Amino acid sequence: MAKSVAIGIDLGTTYSCVGVFQHGKVEIIANDQGNRTTPSSVAFTDTERLIGDAAKNQVALNPQNTVFDAKRLIGRKFGDPVVQGDMKHWPFRVINDGDKPKVQVSYKGETKGFYPEEISSMVLTKMKEIAEGYLGHPVSNAVITVPAYFNDSQRQATKDAGVIAGLNVLRIINEPTAAAIAYGLDRTGKGERNVLIFDLGGGTFDVSILTIDDGIFEVKATAGDTHLGGEDFDNRLVNHFVEEFKRKHKKDYSQNKRAVRRLRTACERAKRTLSSSTQASLEIDSLFEGIDFYTSITRARFEELCSDLFRSTLEPVEKALRDAKLDKAQIHDLVLVGGSTRIPKVQKLLQDFFNGRDLNKSINPDEAVAYGAAVQAAILMGDKSENVQDLLLLDVAPLSLGLETAGGVMTALIKRNSTIPTKQTQIFTTYSDNQPGVLIQVYEGERAMTRDNNLLGRFELSGIPPAPRGVPQIEVTFDIDANGILNVTATDKSTGKANKITITNDKGRLSKEEIERMVQEAEKYKAEDEIQRERVGAKNALESYAFNMKSVVEDEGLKGKISEADKKKVLDKCQEVISWLDANTLAEKDEFEHKRKELEQVCNPIISGLYQGAGGPGPGGFGAPDLKGGSGSGPTIEEVD
């Protein structure tokens, strides 16, 4: 096996991408369809599980069992208003499991529930397989990216998804920081530059300001919205056309999942068209109750429908500039990342905000994040290529971290935009006389009161010797590692008694046992997928062999060289097999193979006799002419629009 390499995975809301750094450069790896990005979708059918393009391609036929947007659920509570709002747009069911959201689907005739981590792990497994196919050997080490504005629970849940997928997650890094590496890697030696990364993807939005100076990438500030992206623009278009259909045809199909799914696919296509044309047309045959829906939309109308969303991208830009204590004139480069930055209006708003400055479009907005992640993966594996060995990444914590003190006040130990890894210690004391213990409640957020912030976890430090209030000294240490994941320790200085928490037993987190179980299930699903692939392979082989034999004996050129009795024998047996195939499309692999042997026993003696008689070499495996006919023989294709 080759020396161990590590891959970089951009796990996106709508699309994911994987890269590897080898021989001094990054390769973005194409999937089996030849695409360099893969849809972050997983579909469950009566017979199999599909991931990526295969899942997205059948979504109109199977909307309620095709899961996407797991990134909008991961690390969130079921009661989160964001989750509740999103559920209105999703065709699949999300259920409440102890305030953790769970996706419910029908798979192989059974109702199954999956946590967002499991769905994301399936996408990660797919990306891992794409890389393994390209490299030709197993891969286990990976760097996975997350939005810079992801909080602790979202980061931890993403890391868990990697573990379930059988990956050793070397590091979780921020998407804009990864993109900055892609941008700055070949631009060394130009002196210090302040770079603003504007990353607007399918579901999340980040702004990061970095200083790049001779291989040192230092993040100065980060801001964003973990719930803004291309999907939200699609939603506006969908709502617009649902209303238009109501006006024109007096019918409402907003509850018909298949119709809405077909409309959404058309809207996504129209949105992309509007980045290069000023008008796009939608043509959907028999959208609802047999009515064809032919309509069009102009770029101006699209911009008007999304104007508030587009404008809202500038608030994080202002916030990041304030936090970095920079004036907009001090930014040297404005770098666009994420597919949604192709929208002309988004570019214009950013350009106008920076007084007409040119935007830098030199990196591929879809691939930059995976590119940077692949570089970081190589560095963590100790790659000594000259262009990466001196590279240093200094990232920041996106949100302030602290604990609750008397009266529900948030006391921050680590301020937002502190460079990580970092460690801060502070002394606290008791609030009442002879208090036997203290409850340490850890929060993240920017508000003054803890009730407005996000509770990450809590633990008790007990056994404090009786003493008047204010006497005991409790030393609390917050320690953030390079993944942006927090450890908190509390020590009673008088007794040396300590207690610690890695914020992993946050209520939304999966326990070690659950992760173990999911790892085993992931293996099981993978094995089932393999069996299904082999089954289909055996079925197709039998089918093409039967049609092949049929066409060989019916060949006009063989007239007179084969007796009618033999010809009838072969044709009857072929017909019998083809009829059996039609009736048994779900048979097992060995049944298909057994049928093939039966057929070969009839055909082989006749066919080989034929070729010996003709003096020609045997036909070997015959170049199967693909004569797929009849129902059940060969795939039945339906246009998905």
Swiss-Prot record:
The modification N6-acetyllysine is found at K77, K108, K246, K348. The lineage of its organism: Eukaryota, Metazoa, Chordata, Craniata, Vertebrata. The modification Phosphothreonine is found at T636. It comes from Sus scrofa. Its main location: cytoplasm. This is Heat shock 70 kDa protein 1A. The gene is HSPA1A. The modification Phosphoserine is found at S631, S633. The keyword 4Fe-4S does not apply. One of its GO terms (cellular component) is cytoplasm.
